[in-house]
Amino acid sequence: MILSGKQIKDSLGKDIVIEPFNEKQINPNSYNLKLHNELLVYDEEVLDMKKPNKTKKLIIPEEGIVLEPRKLYLGRTLEYTETDKYVPMLEGRSSIGRLGVFIHVTAGFGDVGFKGYWTLEIFCVEPIRIYSGVEICQIYYHDVGGDYEKYSSGKYQNNKGIQPSLLYKDFIN
Amino acid sequence: MILSGKQIKDSLGKDIVIEPFNEKQINPNSYNLKLHNELLVYDEEVLDMKKPNKTKKLIIPEEGIVLEPRKLYLGRTLEYTETDKYVPMLEGRSSIGRLGVFIHVTAGFGDVGFKGYWTLEIFCVEPIRIYSGVEICQIYYHDVGGDYEKYSSGKYQNNKGIQPSLLYKDFIN
Amino acid sequence: MILSGKQIKDSLGKDIVIEPFNEKQINPNSYNLKLHNELLVYDEEVLDMKKPNKTKKLIIPEEGIVLEPRKLYLGRTLEYTETDKYVPMLEGRSSIGRLGVFIHVTAGFGDVGFKGYWTLEIFCVEPIRIYSGVEICQIYYHDVGGDYEKYSSGKYQNNKGIQPSLLYKDFIN
């Protein structure tokens, strides 16, 4: 079962936190989230799963920034979210997808109990000028069956902003 | 809860409309949709979220058309659909994905109440010859929790064919 | 409704088979699957939906392999799975997506009744060195509504390993 927009609103302050929240961003069965003006790009010739890959920070200026196709841009949602009792999921908006802009790289699936900003994996098919503050994606919620253990991984929980991959930690222990 | 193929069939003419409909396209828990022969491509050096980007129309001929990797092709489903009471979602088929052809750009998430053809955001990893009429994707349905307001956005509701992004309208009001 | 990690564990040997299974790979509402060391790449200038496209096999060596951006790599899960009563779905992990590595090409949607290894459609935004055995994706489960007919397609059921696209068969009958 996917929560309706009305149910998302009714759950605020109980099982769901979205801050800041704006009624205009409610959809029939989801809620739109905005793009923050910070981006991270990797600074490596070849990335490596086993290493903490170097990154550089970019700020999206008022007049926007042009994204290049063969580059991954890590962004984040303006909104901070917390979710209990439901599985939060992120997907792009069709208006964004129709411009060939991916907002995640097969990684829109969340965990019940996750707290923080959502890091976005942005990739474009054709060069495109984007702007911070745009409603770039939507969050939606599934009910979860049976009892569960909340998300508590040391990697991305309670994050304060964009986080590059911490996959290399899997190879250490 | 995802509707089974049988339930999709039982809901036809009530909460679900798929036209044309063919029993052979029913799967265990989804229904296959076909590719129309029209495509739109953008006609811009650099796309811009704040502008109505120019497009050109292509027709897929009988012998098929070769898609190029660094190009976004907007297509559409042959079928017209309407959905009430459930959240409709679109995903590719594994036979299509195994050829490296994306059918949406993180935008397979629908809205309860949506009426129209589905615009497909087609992008290929390697050059590939595709054909119109192929069963290119599948529609599936989730139940929605609680009462809801049906999709009624002025952008894509009751569309008559492929629609490029109308994101620029977000920046006007 | 999405199964919690605990429910996935409780369903093992009944409606869900995951072999091999390791408790450490359970998440709040999914289970992580590992990457086998075999890859297939297509050996064609231009792929064609109507033809059985030629492929070449690669083995990921101990020191890993560098993936190139404009290439599709078909891999597979180490684990064999069977699912009844639920719809199995595959999605990447955020640690993998944050490195720009797709693990499916809009094809993460499964069928109730599917038995076999999952073929992965791997595509990277930037060049990256990957390693076999890494926890590359996660499987999660939705309940299915009403009675259903289990997946029994001749194409990918009971597979023994990576399978390239068999789409051309759709054009034969």
UniProtKB/Swiss-Prot annotation, chains A, B, C:
Keywords: Hydrolase, Nucleotide metabolism, Nucleotide-binding. InterPro entries: dCTP_deaminase, dUTPase-like_sf, dUTPase_trimeric. One of its GO terms (molecular function) is nucleotide binding. The record marks 108-109 as: Important for bifunctional activity. It is an enzyme of class 3 (hydrolase). Its EC number is 3.5.4.30. It comes from the Bacteria. GO terms for biological process: dUMP biosynthetic process; dUTP biosynthetic process; nucleobase-containing small molecule interconversion. Pathway: Pyrimidine metabolism; dUMP biosynthesis; dUMP from dCTP: step 1/1. CDD domains: trimeric_dUTPase (cd07557). DCTP binds at residues 93-98, 111, 119-121, 138, 151. Homotrimer. PANTHER family: DCTP DEAMINASE (PTHR42680:SF3). Belongs to the dCTP deaminase family. Bifunctional enzyme that catalyzes both the deamination of dCTP to dUTP and the hydrolysis of dUTP to dUMP without releasing the toxic dUTP intermediate. This is dCTP deaminase, dUMP-forming. It comes from Clostridium acetobutylicum (strain ATCC 824 / DSM 792 / JCM 1419 / IAM 19013 / LMG 5710 / NBRC 13948 / NRRL B-527 / VKM B-1787 / 2291 / W). The lineage of its organism: Bacteria, Bacillati, Bacillota, Clostridia, Eubacteriales.
